[in-house]
Amino acid sequence: MNNQADKGRFFPPEWYPQSGIMLTWPHQDTDWLPWLAEVDALYARITREIIPHERVLVVYRDEEHRQHIVNMLQSMDIPSSEILFTQSDSNDTWARDHGPITVYDQQHPVLLDFGFDGWGGKFKAERDNLINKTLHAHGIFPGCTLQSLDIILEGGSIETDGQGTLLTTSRCLLDGIRNPSLQRRDMERILRENFGIDRILWLDHGYLAGDDTDSHIDTLARFCSADTIAYVACKDPADEHYAELLKMEQQLQDFRDYQGNPYHLVPLPMPRPHLDEEGNRLPATYANFLIINDAVLVPTYEDPHNDQEALTRLAGAFPERQIIGVNCSVLIQQHGSLHCISMQLLKDVI
């Protein structure tokens, strides 16, 4: 057994014990405005599913926004005893990418605060980039060290097995826009230093149409355990994703786990195509699930056959956890899904 937690710097997997989930709640000055009532209700539904398992940290914009959220939760009979409210203005709601990443240093929780630039400057992010510092200054993370770094890195771009392995995509981390002065060797050094990892698995293939993130790993392939990876598989040769996802699958088959064995691979179906108002395809993916204490929240997309197949396959990958489907069709209207809007805060953080 590779006891990574006994090392100086430890990057835990998502199934590590959690103290809470961070949600940066949508408001009327975000791009969610056309769908605000629907996305509000979805955030409330997600909150309802999480609080039996752990706390929810709700980041609200101002007092009027907080009161709106409280009133809505009360109207839905959602108890607030496990909800922690904190104020910080925001450009958008993608907590996975602007939220803090929990590591442990000598078993002490450290929150990594990487720079966030709206996925290579595609969108404004100056307020999102201050959220972690604001929350830390508010005392939301008592006893935690906040380590701010100048490097641009999003939480959705990295996965770990908790055994010293980091899984990521070259298309995102080496895009030449986020960190133009960094080569692969530089990025690998930064990842090793800050996450305490031993090895990096680079996926060079795989994308989703409509994805703004340049192939975040959390849209494509996810660790379910130290020896199991769930991934998006495309079975339709006529689909534009077919060739790239086949190459990704072949690369995953070539990877070895931390003990030198092939990974157990769990193929997830692709949902039926979802289109925006202009007819452009939206990045619906079942790989964007969220692991919480004793459960897994899985995005569904009003596609009964594929939704059920994804839930069944993930139930097999997480036999000791409750599998909870959550309709996330509205989230893909802004090109993300369930994992993208949430960030786990591991034990002893809140």
Q: Over which residues does each language-model region extend?
A:
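The feature marks the mature, well-folded catalytic cores of soluble enzymes
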Residues: 1-350
